[in-house]
Amino acid sequence: MEFSMNATVEQLAPVEQQATTDWVVAALYQFKEVADAADLQQRLLDLVKTINLCGTLIVASEGINGTVAGDRHAIDTIREFLLNEGFHAMEYKESHSAEKPFRKMKIKLKQEIVTLGVEVKPRDLVGHYLDPKEWNELISRDDVILVDTRNDYEYKAGTFKGAIDPKTETFREFPDYVKQNLEQHKDKKIAMFCTGGIRCEKSTSLLLQEGFNEVYHLKGGILKYLEETPAEESLWEGECFVFDGRTAVTHGVEEGQNVKCHACGWPLTPEEVALPSYEHGVSCVYCIEKTTEKQKEGFRMRQSQIAAAKRKRL
């Protein structure tokens, strides 16, 4: 039986800290046995009440995962706390944002730190890790099947040249995709990638568990690739969707040009924003025909409330 216990703490940092203009964004995860996940959740809650931090951390018996943002002191504090808790092998990446990327700080207690819905053992069985140079060499080969393990809206913002889109809406759908589309390719080289690497820890573990022979994944995910790979050597096309206020990033992990439709969540290019179907917070080319006028009116009301709240803070 799946459970999900969420705890949310509002920002309690001093006003002068809230004026941060250089938000350090830290994406992190590690698969590690956690003896008492509920206790770790509570101690994290106690800590984040004392520092200027926003974002989400997911805690489970299998480890920790999340993205948080704050000033330098806050990020260093949370990282030191996790290191002291034994998370010495975290996959950890930093980038920057000029604006606050998340509204709140959430610490969630869940059954999985990334939900696949199928039991796998990524601490014991995972695919071969490849650095960016090795990755470029592998996916340039004709005998490799390249699979994007992310969701459809993420694929839309950008992907690697030649990558297959599984057309999943959630990661839970990925095991079914494997059964229906990859089972006949167990003797092939399979290369997989995701945003920060965590979904590939589970997807490669799944394939190996199912009897696939050669399974590879990009160490550190797309974010690490964009951070380390010069644009002129890159096989990445488009931008990388991220789950914060930046919407998407590009090479150097710099903020991209895509913006998010706040009605449906899909990333939009500047050209799509210029279409008549786009109304900020209300509709875009991908959802305008999928919502009723009553729903659109509700979205407009929500946007008015958001705008009023922003004016009040100024």
From Swiss-Prot:
Write out the similarity annotation.
Belongs to the TrhO family.
| Function of the molecule | Catalyzes oxygen-dependent 5-hydroxyuridine (ho5U) modification at position 34 in tRNAs.
Instruction: List, for all copies, the residue spans of the domain called Rhodanese.
Output: 140-234
Q: What keywords are assigned to this protein?
A: Oxidoreductase, tRNA processing
Any idea which residues are catalytic in this one?
C194 (cysteine persulfide intermediate)
* InterPro entries per record: Rhodanese-like_dom, Rhodanese-like_dom_sf, TrhO, TRHO_N
Entry EC no(s): 1.14.-.-
Cited Pfam families: Rhodanese (PF00581), UPF0176_N (PF17773)
A GO term, aspect molecular function: oxidoreductase activity, acting on paired donors, with incorporation or reduction of molecular oxygen
Please name the GO terms of the biological process aspect recorded for this protein, alphabetically.
Answer: tRNA modification
The gene name on file is trhO
Reaction equation(s) it catalyzes: uridine(34) in tRNA + AH2 + O2 = 5-hydroxyuridine(34) in tRNA + A + H2O
The molecule here is called tRNA uridine(34) hydroxylase
